[in-house]
Every structure is written in structure tokens, then in C-alpha cells.
Amino acid sequence: MASDIREKIIDASWELFHEKGFGETTINDIINKADISKGTFYYYFRSKDNLLDTLSEILDREYERLSKEEPEGMGAFDKLMWANYEVHEFIQQNIDYRLFAYLYSAQIIKETGSSLLDRNRYYFRYLERIMEEGRRSGEFTDIMSLREMVKFFSMGERALITEWCMNNGNFDLGEYSRKLFPVMMKGLKR
């Protein structure tokens, strides 16, 4: 029950951030959209800024959804490219590029760890599972450890998102990823 309320707040917040922008969204907007009391909001979050740290949860939910929809008979590399495209489409449609730019810059100057880089995230387990499949089938190289492969992949994804942010979201992130990411990740293949 408690996690349902927290998720409801997170979902309402990110919808509003996308619709109105982060700066224009108030805590009262979030409270009204989530249909909760002010006390309930503050029970789960100290401020609106704390909601930015939930982006990793939003993205992990999307990866969990995708893991249930993986196309049959697809090799590991193609599965990774498919998931990358799908998530980047999701990002473009649901998350303002300025929020990513803000989050990335905040993580660079912040002394505490990033929830986006938390190795316990579903995202990293998902990538590792697929890469392990690819390694077992002989599709992926063995010159890097699985951990290095996952890191390489996630760095590539962040590079594309950073490029999108630096261009003010002025290109189709999904299509850009579909075209460039396989070229960037070719080094994973045997």
C-alpha cells in the first residue's frame, strides 16, 4: 500500500514535469494530481527536488515492462538495440530534455552517489542478463568482463542522451539511437 502511494506521487510528478515543466510544477499540483494530502506528500518526499532522484525508478519500470515484451528469437545484440530504442523513445515522449540535463549536471558536481548509476538497479541487472546470454551464445566478445560491457553500454546510452540534451531535444532521440547506437556498440560483438 505504501509503495503504491509513493508510485502514485512519482507518476503524477513526472507527468506534470513533462506537461508543465519542472519549474512550473508546484507541490500543490502534484498533490492534486495524485489525489493525496500535503502530509502524505511530505511523508514520502522532503521537497519537489527529491522527486528528481526517482528518474531511475521510472526508467527501471520501463525496462521491466520491456523485459516482458522482448521479441522472440532475437539475438542478444539486437535485443539490446531494441531495448535502447524503446527506452529512448519513452524518454523523448515522457521526460523533458532539460530535466535530464539538470540531473546529469547535478550528478557531475554532487559528492553523493547517483541513483542513475546504482549497480543494484533493475537496468543494470537487465543489461547483464542479456549480455550474459550473448556471451554464452558466442555473440559477444570475451575481451571485456560482463561488468565492463554493461558499463560500456550504459556510457554509450548516456552519451546519446547528453547529445540530445545539448541540442535542446531538437532531434528524434529514438531514431538517432536506432541509427548510431549499433555502430557505437559494435565492439561488444565477437
Regions found by a protein language model. Give the residues of each.
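Basic, helix-initiating cap at the start of DNA-binding domains
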Residues: M1-K20, E24-I36, D49-N50
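Short coil/turn segments at alpha/beta junctions that flank glycine-rich nucleotide-binding fingerprints
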Residues: E19-G23, G73, N94, S137
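Short hydrophobic/aromatic patch on the recognition helix
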Residues: D35-F45
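Alpha-helical DNA-contacting segments of helix-turn-helix folds
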Residues: L51-L59
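Hydrophobic alpha-helical connector segments
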Residues: T54, K68-N94, L146-F153, G174
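C-terminal peripheral helix-coil segments that are non-catalytic and often amphipathic
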Residues: E86-E89, R125, R129-S137, S154-M155, ...
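Short secondary-structure transition hinges
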Residues: E89-E128, E139, E148
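All-alpha amphipathic helical-bundle segments outside canonical DNA-binding/catalytic cores
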Residues: L117-N120, R136-F152, D172-E175
